A protein has these predicted regions:
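A short, conserved structural fragment
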Residues: 61-71
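Short amphipathic alpha-helical interaction segments
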Residues: 47-62
Length: 210
C-alpha cells in the first residue's frame, strides 16, 4: 500500500467520528487542495484497496465533509472545521513545462473540456481552485506519478509529483500527452489562432520555443 501522508491529528471542536486512516485521507485532500475528486483517481493516488477507500469515503460523506456527485465527490466547507496540521513529509512538485495559452481563448471552456478526461497514461484525479488559479490533476495508471496543470490567466504550468517513481522521462511523456490534448482543444474551440503557445519552457536542460 502506498502511504497517504504522515500527519498530526488534533481533535476538532466539532464532533466527528473519524479514524486515523480517515484523517490521513482528509489530510491528502486538504494538502492537494482538492475541490472535487474521483474515486478511481484517489484510489490510484493512495494505493488503498477499493473496499477500504469506499468505507472511508462513506464515513466522510456521513459526516458531511464530502458530497457524492454524478462525476465523483465534492469537498464541502466542513473540512475547514478539522484541525489537520501541516504534514511533516510532503511530496514536492517538479516543474516540467511553462507555456502560454492564446489570449483570446476561453479558458473556462478549456477547463470544462479537460475536467474528468482520461487519455494516454493519465487518469483523472481532481481539480483545485485558489488565488493561484485553477489546477487540474491527473495520475498515471500505476499511481507512480501525479501530473498537474495550473492555469492562471493565460499562463499554463505543468508540474509532476514523483510518488513512487523518479522516472522523469515518463513524467515528460505524460506532460506531452497532456499538451497534445490541450492543443487539440485550443484548435477546436477557436479558428482564429491554431497555435497553442507563444513561448514554451522545458525544464530538462534545454529550452524550446514554439
Amino acid at each position: 500500500m502506498i502511504p497517504v501522508l504522515n500527519v498530526n491529528w488534533q481533535s476538532p471542536e466539532a464532533d466527528y467520528s473519524l479514524s486515523e486512516r480517515d484523517t490521513d485521507l482528509l489530510a491528502l485532500i486538504e494538502t492537494e487542495d482538492l475541490a472535487t475528486f474521483t474515486f478511481d483517481g484517489l484510489k490510484r493516488r493512495t494505493g488503498l484497496h477499493s473496499e477500504t477507500l469506499s468505507r472511508i469515503l462513506s464515513r466522510l460523506e456521513e459526516e458531511g465533509i464530502i458530497k457524492k456527485e454524478p462525476c465523483g465527490y465534492r469537498v464541502t466547507t466542513k473540512i475547514t472545521e478539522l484541525k489537520l496540521q501541516t504534514p511533516r513529509k510532503e511530496t514536492p512538485s517538479t516543474p516540467l513545462m511553462q507555456t502560454y495559452l492564446p489570449s483570446d481563448l476561453k479558458t473556462q471552456q478549456l477547463i470544462l473540456n479537460l475536467e474528468g478526461k482520461w487519455f494516454g497514461m493519465l487518469r483523472w484525479l481532481g481539480i483545485s481552485e485558489n488565488n493561484q488559479g485553477v489546477t487540474l490533476k491527473w495520475i498515471t495508471e500505476d499511481g507512480a506519478i501525479q501530473i498537474a496543470a495550473n492555469i492562471q490567466g493565460t499562463a499554463l504550468n505543468i508540474e509532476a509529483k514523483f510518488l513512487t517513481s523518479n522516472n522523469l522521462n515518463l513524467a515528460l511523456k505524460a506532460s506531452y500527452q497532456l499538451m497534445s490534448l490541450i492543443g487539440k482543444l485550443c484548435i477546436s474551440t477557436q479558428a482564429t489562432r491554431p497555435a497553442v503557445a507563444q513561448n514554451a519552457g522545458y525544464f530538462g536542460g534545454s529550452l524550446m520555443s514554439a
